[in-house]
């Protein structure tokens, strides 16, 4: 059994270069998660299970003042280099499908990406949080759950 809760997309910066979770698009995040899943599958027993706890985010709620690494597609926080660097923000630009204030759907995008890569999507479990972290939003309800996927 493997149980993990990877860094959620665009929600935390742990201060490590090349860290997972600071990809410039949801698609790049899912692509990297699928690559991680391939490595997990390689070391998991044939009858083993993979439990994935993952939360969501909203388009437009990403980091500001970051630089896009053109080679890796990752966001680099706290860049102290040239002021000519392209200033980008995760979830603040335009997207073909996702609009400002849309829930990005990272949990399901991730689960379906892993399924497309050969994992069996066995179950989705709602982790209900009776005392969630308060949010300062006025146009939607406070998020009070995360997903756990059994793969």
Q: Which role fits each region the language model picked out?
A:
Residues 1-151:
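Core catalytic lobe of class I
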């Amino acid at each position: 059994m493997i149980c993990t809760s990877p860094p959620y997309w665009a929600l935390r910066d742990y201060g490590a270069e090349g860290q997972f979770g600071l990809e410039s698009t949801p698609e790049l995040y899912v692509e990297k998660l699928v690559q991680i899943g391939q490595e997990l599958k390689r070391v998991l027993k044939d009858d083993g299970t993979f439990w994935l706890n993952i939360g969501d985010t909203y388009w437009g709620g990403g980091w500001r003042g970051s630089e896009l690494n053109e080679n890796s597609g990752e966001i680099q926080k706290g860049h102290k280099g040239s002021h000519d660097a392209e200033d980008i923000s995760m979830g603040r630009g335009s997207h073909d499908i996702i609009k400002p204030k849309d829930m990005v759907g990272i949990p399901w995008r991730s689960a379906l990406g892993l399924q497309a890569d050969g994992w069996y999507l066995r179950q989705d479990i709602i982790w209900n949080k009776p005392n969630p972290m308060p949010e300062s939003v006025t146009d939607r309800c406070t998020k009070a759950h995360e997903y756990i996927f059994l793969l």
